[in-house]
């Protein structure tokens, strides 16, 4: 079994998603022998955002590529191959200003690649990366799971929809809310999230 574990929080040891994503990954390794783990810390080792130069390589012969285009094309290919090869993904994705960290968006922009992870057909787009399980580890300072709060959720819903576009339908969410609403609520939310992790079908 191949596990791809991504963290995107910029908060290092103060991060709730890092703490919880580590528990998910450890739980998977405890339940299954021979788990091959690939880990990317997208905050400590950020992936460059797409630029005109990077995308321009698609419209030029490889012999004309710049050094940056060559290195970034190689990185994109590596990220896509990691994604395709993984049986399970654990994604630590905190809510920042109602959305995801920019570091995670950079990763998504590399792996959402036409012709590799999805394709366009006469009947619309088709995802090319099925048969994967994703555990999305979410943390929010406030509460956004209710009807009103969900109107400001461009975090979980976005990630789930992008993954679905790529063909991934098996997504489970581990959520810790009210992290910024006092130490008691923070502790309770983390405790409940860990209980939910123990019940995951991994």
Curated annotation (Swiss-Prot):
Recorded superkingdom: Bacteria
Broad enzyme group: oxidoreductase
Protein EC: 1.6.5.-, 1.7.1.17
Catalytic activity line of the entry: 2 a quinone + NADH + H(+) = 2 a 1,4-benzosemiquinone + NAD(+); N,N-dimethyl-1,4-phenylenediamine + anthranilate + 2 NAD(+) = 2-(4-dimethylaminophenyl)diazenylbenzoate + 2 NADH + 2 H(+)
Keyword Flavoprotein in annotation: yes
Cofactor: binding comment: Binds 1 FMN per subunit.
MF annotations from Gene Ontology: electron transfer activity; FMN binding; oxidoreductase activity, acting on NAD(P)H as acceptor; oxidoreductase activity, acting on NAD(P)H, quinone or similar compound as acceptor
Residues annotated as binding FMN: 9, 95-98
Cofactor: FMN
Alphabetic keyword roster: Flavoprotein, FMN, NAD, Oxidoreductase
SUPFAM superfamilies: Flavoproteins
Oligomeric form and interacting partners: Homodimer.
Protein family according to the UniProt entry: Belongs to the azoreductase type 1 family.
Protein function: Quinone reductase that provides resistance to thiol-specific stress caused by electrophilic quinones.
HAMAP family: Azoreductase_type1
Protein known as: FMN-dependent NADH:quinone oxidoreductase
Organism: Chromobacterium violaceum (strain ATCC 12472 / DSM 30191 / JCM 1249 / CCUG 213 / NBRC 12614 / NCIMB 9131 / NCTC 9757 / MK)
